[in-house]
Amino acid sequence: MKKTIILIFFFSNLCLGQHQSAYKNGEWLNFKISYSGWIKAGKASLELNEDKSTGLYHVKAIGKTTGPIKWFFKVEDYYQSYFSSKSGLPKKFIRKINEGGHTKNLTIDFDQISNKA
């Protein structure tokens, strides 16, 4: 029983001591997308920036078709998300897509106080 209490106390302190964010300002990822490994199909990118004045992270995601695939099925997708750098709670989401003629523009504002989107 004594060992169990000591272990619980030890591990609870480890969890409380972690304050480091998983994100860093300026992080980005770029992807080249291919069909069967040799036909260029598209590209995608993710980018994260922190606005110190508002305390928000701004994430941009872009996906587009390239090469011969673009002639048959054109895709241009843009996503943006804003979320708190402290709590991780979302503030705003923007979606603007064009996938082969199917378009959708969507903006969602999140109000954490009234629990509404």
Which residues does each PLM region occupy?
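Solvent-exposed helix/loop surface patches that form functional interfaces
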Residues: 24-26, 103-117
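N-terminal cleavable signal peptides for secretion/export
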Residues: 16-80, 86, 93-102
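Sec-dependent N-terminal signal peptides
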Residues: 4-13
